[in-house]
């Protein structure tokens, strides 16, 4: 999709420039007595840290960009405080002390953030929502489990080694319906991971069925050519008893309607309108609306959607960059939102993480929605 220069070369140039910036910033440290006696410490320590940073950042799509981003942010904050102190008349000794802290503290804070973000990413939660409706439901209730934005790989929060944990949490919810709202796989997914997760979906007992809508990564080549194709995905889903919905409306025997939309980005917006998916408009059938990206909520509600389930945002994943980017493009970043008196939207934070085992915003979760007829 993108030229290799913008994907890989430009990020490396930017990473190198930031490394040099951090090195120069570190040299602002005052030449203390120990440093004066051992000049190698004054120049060698920041150089060593710069080399460490360069090693961490060797993959422009990896965790290094997150590490550098936090480190630069903390450096800027510290330097800003030091310059402010100088401007308001702080003593030279005090200002130098701030500069010293500006050299050491960002590394300590960044190390803590990286540790905490990893723990947060790897903690798989079950998030439960309770909704009521006046429409008829099978046995007066409906329980839906939503899986979204998994993309399994060794460097991310979810891979085949965590399938037993995921299976246990899904089974504990006892779903009537299993829905997979896109980006379950991506262009970095290996065939073995595809097969393992499709096998998992086949093992899940969901009496009312299992449904899948595509996201912008499942078959869309953002970064590289994937090692599997559409036929492989369709075959794996079919074997697992999962139905792929692409601008499709399905009526279940129990009277519940499932609508699955094509992804907006994957199709460049070339998809059916909400009204075209339910030509008759709202009726007395409870309608579950699956759309990978949280957008077009009002039109979906007007067409007859009672519950909209989406993903895509990862709940922001890396604060604040993720929050700013997602809010700008989507109608909801994470969680539950009341669209109308009869329609509710829920956006998952993702059952995995994108790119790396790191999360400072949102939750790594499966979503369990309990709908009761009143």
Per-region residue spans from a language model:
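Non-catalytic terminal accessory segments
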Residues: 1-124
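N-terminal signal-anchor transmembrane helix
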Residues: 85-105, 109-173
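Soluble catalytic domains of enzymes that build or remodel membrane lipids, polysaccharides, and related
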Residues: 136-374
């Amino acid at each position: 999709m993108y030229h290799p220069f913008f994907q890989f070369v430009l990020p490396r140039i930017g990473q190198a420039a930031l490394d040099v910036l951090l090195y120069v910033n570190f040299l602002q440290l005052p030449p203390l007595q120990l440093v004066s006696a051992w000049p190698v410490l004054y120049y060698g320590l920041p150089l060593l840290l710069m080399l460490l940073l360069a090693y961490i950042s060797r993959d422009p799509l990896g965790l290094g960009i997150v590490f550098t981003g936090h480190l630069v942010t903390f450096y800027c904050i510290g330097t800003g405080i030091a310059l402010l102190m100088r401007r308001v008349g702080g003593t030279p000794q005090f200002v130098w002390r701030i500069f010293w802290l500006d050299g050491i503290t960002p590394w300590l804070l960044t190390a803590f953030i990286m540790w905490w973000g990893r723990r947060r990413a790897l903690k798989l939660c079950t998030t439960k929502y309770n909704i009521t409706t006046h429409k008829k439901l099978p046995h007066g209730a409906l329980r839906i489990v939503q899986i979204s934005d998994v993309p399994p790989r060794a460097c991310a929060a979810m891979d085949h080694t965590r399938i037993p944990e995921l299976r246990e949490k899904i089974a504990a919810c006892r779903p009537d319906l299993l829905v997979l709202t896109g980006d379950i796989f991506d262009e970095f997914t290996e065939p073995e991971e595809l097969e393992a997760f499709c096998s998992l979906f086949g093992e899940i007992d969901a009496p009312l069925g299992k449904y899948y809508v595509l996201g912008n990564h499942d078959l869309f080549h953002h970064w590289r050519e994937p090692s599997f194709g559409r036929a492989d995905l369709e075959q794996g889903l079919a074997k697992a008893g999962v139905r792929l919905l692409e601008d499709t409306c399905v009526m279940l025997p129990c009277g519940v309607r499932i609508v699955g939309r094509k992804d907006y980005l994957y199709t460049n917006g070339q998809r059916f309108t909400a009204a075209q998916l339910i030509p008759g408009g709202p009726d007395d059938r409870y309608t579950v609306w699956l759309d990978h990206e949280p957008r077009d909520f009002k039109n979906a509600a007007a067409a007859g959607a009672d519950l909209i389930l989406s993903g895509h945002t990862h709940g922001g994943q890396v604060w604040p960059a993720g929050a700013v980017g997602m809010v700008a493009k989507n109608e909801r970043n994470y969680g539950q939102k009341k669209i109308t008196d009869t329609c509710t939207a829920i956006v998952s934070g993702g059952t995995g993480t994108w790119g790396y085992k790191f999360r400072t915003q949102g939750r790594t979760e499966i979503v369990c929605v309990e709908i009761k007829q009143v």
